[in-house]
Amino acid sequence: INGMQVEFKFEDDEHDAEKSVNAYNSLKDWGMQVLAGPVTTTPTLAVAAESVNDNMFVLTPSASAQTVIETGDNVFQICFTDPNQGVASADYIAENALATKIGVIYDSSDAYSSGIYAKFKTEAETKGLEIVTAEAFTSDNKSDLSTQVAKCQEAGAELVFLPIYYTEASQI
């Protein structure tokens, strides 16, 4: 790039805080000078805390928690934040009159999911939307969400808001 030799090396953080720090340290030992990643919030927060000590430039393309860039002056994020997603989702539902009774299924053990849900809840209330039920799951019990779906149906939800990753959403 511009006459400079660039070498890329990849490590998989498996969306796990401890594994992401191990991957970061492995890349640092290899000689990394710039980190492009991690891509999700939980690993990024863990790596960002480590990178401050090293003053390593970190650029995450898609970690969306607002706290990501609060870690240090060396950490940058490209995409929109969780609060923006929650607000925009509630605004869209209200402005397009998609529903007034909303069920929510979210991952209470995940900063991304919880962050979007928290802001969605606040904005939904200001828009006159009623959250009839909010059903949580955790990373330990995310393989079957049929109970959460049934509770949304029982509560009379006209729409179910899913601030979750596609793997979990694909089960619904």
Mark where each language-model region is.
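Flexible, small-residue-rich helix->loop connector segments that border functional cores
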Residues: 1-2, 93
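Beta-alpha junction/loop-to-helix N-cap segments that form part of ligand/metal-binding clefts
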Residues: 2-70, 78, 137-139, 143-145, ...
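Non-catalytic positions within long, well-ordered alpha-helices that form the structural scaffold/packing
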Residues: 21, 28, 94-95, 153
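Short, high-confidence coil segments that cap the C-terminus of an alpha-helix
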Residues: 31-33, 99, 156-158
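Structural motif
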Residues: 36, 159-163
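Aromatic/hydrophobic pocket-lining residues that form π-stacking "cages" and hydrophobic walls in ligand
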Residues: 47, 120, 172
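An alpha-beta-alpha
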Residues: 75-140, 159
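Short amphipathic alpha-helix with an adjacent loop that forms part of the alpha/beta core around
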Residues: 145-153
